[in-house]
From Swiss-Prot:
Residues 99-123, 181-270, 311-362, 400-459 are annotated as: Disordered. GO terms for biological process: regulation of signal transduction. This is Striatin homolog. Residues 337-346 have a biased composition (Polar residues). GO terms for molecular function: calmodulin binding. It is a peripheral membrane protein. The keyword Cytoplasm applies. It is found in: Cytoplasm; Membrane.
Length: 827
């Protein structure tokens, strides 16, 4: 019995520990050990890396410390050297200053026994000149007191002959000074009389005073060496050169020189006063011209030019009257001597008048040329087209002299002579003023004549001709203004690490956001794309990188709760992690380098629990706090963004196996209907108020369960911003146009050589752009359904190329995001 019990126990023990169980147990334990070992190895590697990093940082800090110590020592040494240099320089400067002070003290000391200057002819002549100047009253200005005391002893030792000559010259200088006072008084009276006579009448000039005439005649008859005078154009002596005095003719020469010096003074004073008056008049006219030119008006500018011309004419007439009076004095004198000089002076006056008139005419013609050039070469000048036989119309209404026969010109011509006669009677020189005023009136009338001819030409046209008139800007070069825009590549943004799935432009601010498969959202500043001198195509970094999703981000959308551009201060994003997140928009003024490594609280809300699979598309309903989302779980959900609640869900009539790929709101339905495209190629129109299917625009294919072989899947659906028109891009390379009123297909065309991934409509509603996985972007005219431009963009990656495209709503930007993780900006 005992043996049997032992055998049963062994059998039971063998049944518990069988060979396979033991092997499984050992394998499991071995796997656990290997996993732990792998963890240990990874932790060891991390620790070794950390140790290496800390050691490298320690070495780096030591090198920095050593470098800083070297710099401190170098600066201390340099400071010591500078101090030594400054001390040595200060000592040298003190020594130099002491030497200079000693030299100045030695120079100031005058020796007691100073030798008098040697006698010579130069000293005697200098002494004579100094005594002349003392007696004439220039002692304080020219002769210094030190020189007077210096030569007192020398003046006592001069010879008797020189003293006699000095006494004679002293007597003559006293006499000349007395004569000068009388002559100045006489000349001042005579000049006052001459000025009054020249301003009132043009009578011949009175004869000069008898004293001056006799003195000049005697001086010229006696000797030519005593005085040499040069006559001015006005008949007065301008410069006198005094020769060394002699005993016989000293008195006559001194009197003539003094009279010649005293005569031009009152004439100079009068000419200076006239010159000041003329300059003040001209400055006033210039001020009025500058104040009037600030308005940039043609008529006011011409009026100011006339005033400037008249003021210059008056100033010139004043100068001409003075010059004519002086010329008449000269001619009266010259006529007594030579009759030929009179004819020469008249010819000179005529030539001067002709030059003045030609200058004024050129001035007025210059003004006309300026305004003609301004009107002819202005960039915004509009040309009239469709006038028909305008040349024949001109020929019929042209006169014999080539001018248009207008009724207003005769009245203007009759009124102008009265103004001319009235103005000419007030002026002294009648001929010149008439010509000036006629030239100014012709220049001012050029603009009015041009406007009158234009009005007459338009008045001669009929209503049918006026209907054909079109305004065109000639600077743009003809009929090319209606041509479509040509997009050119400008910039590429390379900051993402995986394919770019969504792009959104801010309507008002220069901001763009991009969502990528690298689990991030980047915010870009478009102002950084402006080219500079250093780099015409700068590589910019994003303002901020938003991280929060745990998977690829497929879509993004602005928060349009108020529907205004200024309120687009937050946006939504969704993707593979089935969560919709709301983010606040970073400001465009932040510095991307200062914010590097910082985590800022831009996340506002999260919408969790609404979907059971990835979210493909988001759509914000304008002017409402509602958001639509389409998911791979087969539902379209409506969310309240203020409370983060899911209001309801929409699904295909055939079940949840039909996955919505894209959604759009028809602009003509006041945001009450929803277009939804599915992976089987069907399109449904939902009513958002009743949550019911209104109509089915397109039937889906039968093989909807086999999604891998389904070529009819619609990847993008868009709605026209102004018309009841919807457009779709699908896997079968087609773009289809649907009429929302009749719910029928209007047009279908094969647009690309590969599946179409996205569509976008121009803000004007005239063009649509499409992108496909054949690496091409094509722009289409909606009315003619023709391709306008084809661009090759983005490199393919794993049978994918371009994921998304977007127009800027206000500015001339176009962006595309591809599988190569690059955003390309077109302009």
């Amino acid at each position: 019995m005992d043996n049997q019990n032992n055998n049963n126990a062994l059998a039971n023990g063998d049944s518990q520990f069988t060979m396979p169980k033991v092997i499984d147990y050992l394998q499991n334990e071995w796997l656990k050990f290997e996993v732990d070992r792998a963890h240990w190895i990874s932790e060891k590697a991390e620790l070794t890396n950390r140790i290496l990093k800390l050691e490298s940082e320690r070495k780096l800090f030591e090198s920095h410390k050593f470098d800083l110590c070297r710099r401190v020592k170098m600066l201390e040494y340099a400071l010591q050297q500078e101090r030594l240099k400054n001390n040595s320089l200060l000592q040298q400067q003190q020594k130099v200053i002491e030497k200079v002070e000693e030299e100045e003290e030695e120079d100031d000391k005058i020796p007691k026994n100073r030798e008098p200057p040697k006698k010579s002819k130069d000293n005697t002549t200098r002494l004579i000149i100094r005594k002349y100047l003392r007696e004439m009253g220039y002692n304080d200005l020219i002769v210094s007191k030190s020189l007077q005391t210096e030569f007192e002893n020398d003046s006592q030792n001069i010879d008797n002959d020189t003293t006699n000559t000095i006494d004679d010259t002293n007597d003559t200088t006293v006499k000349t000074i007395l004569n000068l006072k009388d002559i100045n008084n006489n000349n001042s009276n005579n000049n006052n009389k001459n000025q009054t006579t020249t301003t009132t009448t043009t009578s011949p000039s009175p004869s000069p005073s008898p004293s001056t005439s006799t003195s000049t005649s005697t001086s010229s008859n006696k000797t030519d060496n005593t005085t040499t005078t040069t006559t001015n154009g006005n008949g007065y002596n301008s410069n006198t050169i005094i020769s060394p005095p002699s005993s016989s003719s000293s008195s006559s020469s001194s009197s003539s020189s003094s009279s010649s010096q005293s005569q031009p003074q009152p004439q100079l004073q009068s000419s200076l006063s006239e010159l000041i008056n003329n300059t003040t008049d001209l400055s006033q006219s210039l001020d009025s011209l500058s104040s009037a030119s600030s308005g940039y008006e043609y008529d006011s500018l011409l009026d100011n030019l006339k005033q400037l011309d008249n003021s210059s004419v008056s100033s010139n007439s004043g100068n001409n009257s003075i010059n004519s009076s002086s010329d008449s004095l000269d001619t009266s004198k010259q006529s007594q001597e030579d009759p030929n000089n009179v004819t020469i002076s008249k010819q000179q006056q005529q030539e001067q008048q002709q030059q003045q008139e030609s200058d004024e005419q050129s001035f007025n013609s210059f003004n006309e040329d300026i305004f003609n050039k301004l009107t002819a070469n202005s960039k915004g000048r509009m040309k009239i087209k469709g006038l028909g036989n305008l040349k024949n119309y001109k020929k019929e209404h042209m006169g014999e002299e080539g001018n248009l026969s207008l009724p207003d010109q005769n009245t203007e011509e009759k009124s102008t002579p009265t103004t001319k006669s009235s103005s000419s009677s007030s002026s002294s020189s009648t001929g010149s003023t008439r010509k000036k005023k006629s030239s100014s009136s012709s220049s001012s009338g050029s603009s009015s004549s041009n406007s009158n001819t234009m009005n007459s030409e338009l008045m001669g046209l009929g209503a049918s001709d006026l209907n054909d008139i079109t305004l065109d800007d000639g600077s743009k070069g003809g009929n090319d203004s209606a041509a479509p825009r040509v997009w050119k590549f400008k910039h590429s943004l390379k900051s993402h690490f995986d394919g770019v799935r969504s792009i959104q432009f801010h309507p008002n601010e220069p901001i763009m956001i991009s969502a990528s498969e690298d689990n991030s959202i980047k915010v870009w500043n478009l102002n950084h794309l402006v080219p500079t001198k250093k780099s015409p195509s700068p590589e910019i970094e994003p303002l901020y990188t938003i991280r929060g999703h745990t998977g690829p981000v497929f879509t993004s959308e602005w928060n349009q709760i108020n529907g205004e551009y200024s309120n687009y201060q937050s946006f939504f994003s969704a993707g593979y992690d089935m969560i919709i997140r709301q983010w606040s928009l970073p400001s465009s003024d932040i510095d991307s380098y200062l914010q590097h490594g910082k985590i800022l609280p831009y996340l506002e809300k999260e919408f969790i629990g609404g979907h059971q699979d990835g979210i493909w598309d988001l759509l914000s309903i304008p002017n409402t706090p509602n958001l639509l989302s389409s998911s791979a779980d087969g539902t379209v959900s409506l969310w309240n963004t203020t409370t983060s609640e899911q209001l309801y869900t929409l699904q295909h009539s055939n079940g949840l196996s039909y996955i919505p790929t894209s959604i759009a709101l028809p602009a003509t339905e006041n945001n009450r209907k929803l277009l939804t495209s599915y992976n089987d190629g069907s399109i449904l129109l939902f009513d958002l108020e009743t949550q019911q299917i209104i109509s089915q625009l397109k039937q889906g294919s039968s093989n909807n369960n086999n999604n891998n072989n389904n070529n009819s899947q619609i990847n993008k659906i868009v709605s026209h911003p102004f018309m009841p028109l919807a457009m779709t891009g699908s896997e079968d390379h087609k773009i289809e146009f649907f009429d929302l009123n009749s719910n029928t297909v209007v047009h279908s065309m094969i647009a690309h050589s590969n599946s179409i991934s996205s569509l976008t409509i121009d803000p004007s509603g005239l063009y649509i752009a499409s992108c496909a996985h054949d690496s091409s972007i094509r722009f289409w005219d909606i009315s003619s359904k023709t391709c306008i431009q084809d661009l090759n963009s983005h490199r393919p990656k794993y049978d994918e190329s371009i994921h998304c495209i977007k127009y800027h709503p206000n500015k001339g930007y176009f962006a595309s995001g591809g599988a190569d993780s690059v955003i390309r900006i077109l302009n």
